Amino acid sequence: SSFRIMRQVLDRLEDSATGRLLPQSFHCEVPAERLAQAQATAAILGEEVYRRFPWAHYDCGGSTQFALPTTTDPLQALLKRTWEPTLSVTGAEGFPALQDAGNVLRPYTAFKLSLRLPPLVDAAQAVQELKTLLEDNAPYQARVTFDGGGGATGWNAPATTPWFEQALNEASQAHFGASCGYIGQGGTIPLMNMLSEG
């Protein structure tokens, strides 16, 4: 089936048991300053890093069960937000609506993929690598096509200057009674790169 072929092709990209993207070129080393900031923020926020999200839940025999995050380690949760690549399927074609589905083979399966990359990974190069990974040597000589549809490299803030870090900490201490914490946000905002270039 075309869906099984799609699963096999996506298995080249992602470990479905862990969600880890397999191409090493889609990963990068976390800069030392960002790692230190994440460690400090994880110590401040603890479990609130992931508990504050409205996790999906269902009622099972009177006891409410909640979906769990992929990690309950506060530091890892912060790093996964920005410094680990992530695959999401954001759309699908070739599937009838449930009420119209029958016991037939469908002629094709199409997915729209969203790939979030760490800010130090070149997006244009990653798109080309992804195209090769998905299209080459398709199972059963099936025709697999990938249209990159664009992409932009993320942004990593320049190193924090001592005077700015001191000003942030003083303001945070005055208002919150604690040192400043830093949280990176995954997702590309191309404007940030343009602004940083002047």
Go through each PLM region and give its residues.
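Alpha-helical metal-binding/catalytic segments enriched in His/Glu/Asp
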Residues: 1-17, 113
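Generic solvent-exposed, charged/amphipathic alpha-helical segments
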Residues: 7, 11, 131-135, 169
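An extended, acidic, His-containing surface patch that forms the Zn2+-binding/catalytic region
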Residues: 19-108, 116-129, 137, 141-198
